[in-house]
A protein has these predicted regions:
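Bacterial N-terminal signal peptides that target proteins for export
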Residues: 1-8
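Bacterial N-terminal signal peptides
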Residues: 9-16
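Conserved, single-site charged/polar hotspot
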Residues: 21-49, 53-58, 64-86, 92-110, ...
Length: 597
């Protein structure tokens, strides 16, 4: 048996060598990345061996392949490395962890510098090592650092809750277990707005142009009572739902009782809502102290009150834009976002499926009213007055946008399985060459791990975790995510079946010992633990028994990826590109109309 295995290995090595002789170094790198993703690190070892003496990068990949294959004896031959990068530090740490040297493993896991996609997995593994040594104080610090580097890193929440429990911090442990925890080690890093001196909100009597188009924005439902103040008159009303009717009180006196919709007019003023009570308690989804331009309509629905703000479209945008983009961002980016928001609400007004309202706050609009208005965003709305995006047939476009495209936008078909639209066709970052076909596994790994310069990663508009990220799952964690009923047995492999032209995964297979699960594009992010995007490669590390024990999802971008990339727009704007050209880039077949009213 041993002789047969040795002979097979010899034949395989000769076959690999014969193929490698005709390969360039770049082709070898691409092939190795494909082996990493297909769960064949032993093939990567044999291929990398043919180049390792000539190429430091291939030597590096040979070591990583050996660690992935659980071949610690062979991996040890490559050590030490000079100035290892974060990915290499991660695998050196894994090597020492496998060798039982937890202290040295922690040293390598935590010795990288700067932002990188392996920061969260490195800190997480350091925490696991500290926990194995019963050093719960250090474990708490490392898990906290993992969450500071990547707030969506779900395995770290359970681990941090566990060590806090060990340290007697029961209340904190419960918060963390619910995913309700603000990391304190390094602070929130997923967004990075420029730090500038805050500006005051515009006065209530500020008057921009009006469109004459009225938006009906549903602010909240299930309200039982609230107070309303009209700033122009100083009048205060107390409004209640009682015995199937809307009761309006002023200075303690009932002035109106009705079962029909009741509207409070507010021409060119501000209304303020306070002491808001809902069926489930105070405030609910509508914060007390919320202020709005326009009129307020009060309706009865499901034995409670529904509040609908009737407001001019342009004034509505004053309260939308600051909720969609950082107000300190470049003015041309703000103008591009304003046009996109105007186009979106025009479409919603045309296609509203309810008689009561056009949009619902928190569901399909980020509208937050007067409280959120800022001079920069209001000026961006005013300067783009009446400008909107239309289809060639004359309908406003569904001007979708995302936080960060990762360098290539996606399509509605990939994101939701819906029909593609020419104005939402996938486009590369302005600095990136367009794909002619879906990228190969090797090309995708190169694009994510060693990306070219991009507008969607320009400081300070994009933070690294919104641009590139890495999430690690144990085999058991991945099984619980994709197969909670354990119908397919143990996971023995995963496979990307297909990608769209942007490189996003459109079909993903999980192979078990008892069956197979195929995940479609609409469900990939949710099924895999809420990944930031479906632009990723998946690599896995084998245990000594040959089965995978760790899966790494290494990806780019944040959000569905369709339409305008906000950080890309900011990067283009700061480079001197005007808002019209930004819009033409991200909505390629849309027509810009200067007068939509």
């Amino acid at each position: 048996m041993r002789l047969r295995k040795a002979l097979l290995l010899f034949v395989f090595t000769l076959f690999t060598l014969s193929n490698a002789l005709g390969m360039t170094e770049d082709e070898a790198k691409s092939a190795i990345q494909e082996y990493f993703q297909s769960g064949h690190p032993e093939k990567a070892i044999n291929l990398a061996n043919q180049f390792k003496e000539k190429s430091p990068e291939l030597k590096r990949l040979a070591f990583i392949a050996a660690v992935k294959a659980a071949n610690t004896q062979y991996a040890g031959r490559f050590l030490p490395f000079k100035n290892p990068d974060a990915e290499l530090n991660f695998y050196i740490g894994r090597y020492y962890e496998e060798m039982g040297n937890l202290t040295k493993a922690m040293d390598f896991y935590t010795s990288f510098q700067g932002d990188n996609m392996f920061a969260a997995p490195c800190y997480y593994q350091a925490g696991r090592c500290a926990e194995r040594k019963d050093d719960f104080i250090k474990a708490e610090i490392y898990y906290d650092l993992a969450l500071a580097a990547e707030r969506t890193y779900k395995p770290a929440y359970a681990a941090l809750a566990r060590v806090k429990e060990q340290l007697g911090k029961k209340e904190e442990a419960e918060k963390v277990a619910r995913g309700n925890y603000s990391t304190m080690a390094r602070g929130e890093k997923n967004f990075a707005p420029p730090q500038v001196k805050p500006l005051k909100t515009l006065p209530a009597n500020f008057k921009g142009k009006k469109s004459g188009q009225i938006v009906r924005a549903c602010l909240a439902e299930k309200i039982t009572s609230f107070n309303l103040t009209v700033n122009k008159t100083g009048e205060v009303f107390n409004i209640n739902y009682e015995k199937g009717a809307i009761l309006v009180y002023k200075q303690g006196k009932l002035i109106k009782g009705t079962t029909s919709p009741y509207r409070i007019s507010n021409k060119d003023g501000i209304i303020k809502l306070t002491d808001i009570r809902t069926k489930s308690g105070p405030s609910g989804s509508l914060p007390t102290g919320s202020m709005f331009r326009g009129d307020l309509e009060i309706r009865i629905k499901d034995k409670a009150l529904m509040l609908i703000n009737h407001i001019d479209l342009e004034e509505y945008l004053y309260g939308v834009l600051p909720s969609e983009m950082f107000t300190e961002w470049h003015y041309e980016a703000l103008k591009a976002q304003a046009v996109a928001a105007r186009s979106y609400i025009l479409l919603k007004m045309q296609s509203s499926t309810t008689a009561e309202y056009d949009v619902y706050v928190g569901k399909n609009t980020a509208y937050r009213g007067y409280n959120r208005e800022k001079p920069q965003t209001t000026a961006a709305v005013d300067e783009t007055f009446g400008i909107a995006l239309f289809t060639p047939l004359g309908s406003p476009i569904d001007a979708l946008f995302c936080t960060n495209s990762g360098g290539y936008t996606s399509s509605p078909a990939t994101a939701w399985g819906s029909q593609n639209q020419g104005f939402l066709a996938p486009v590369p970052d302005k600095k990136v060459k367009a794909n002619t076909t879906a990228p190969s596994p090797g090309q995708m790994a190169e694009f994510i791990k060693s990306p070219p310069p991009m507008y969607c990663y320009v400081a300070p508009y994009a933070s690294y975790p919104s641009y590139r990220w890495c999430v690690q799952y144990s085999r058991e964690e991945l099984e619980n995510l994709v197969d909670p009923q354990h119908t397919i047995g143990y996971i023995k492999g995963v496979q990307v079946n297909s990608r769209d032209i942007s490189g996003r995964v459109t079909s993903f297979t999980v192979q078990g010992t008892l069956g197979v699960i195929v995940i479609g594009s609409r469900d990939i992010r949710a099924k895999l633990g809420g990944l930031k995007s479906s632009m990723f490669v998946c690599e896995y590390q084998l245990a000594r028994n040959g089965l995978p024990n760790t899966f790494l999802f290494i990806g780019g971008g944040w959000g569905h990826g369709v339409g305008l990339c906000q950080t890309g727009a900011a990067g283009m704007a700061v480079s001197g590109i005007k808002f019209r050209d930004i819009l033409k880039h991200y909505y390629p077949e849309a027509i810009i109309k200067d007068k939509c009213y």
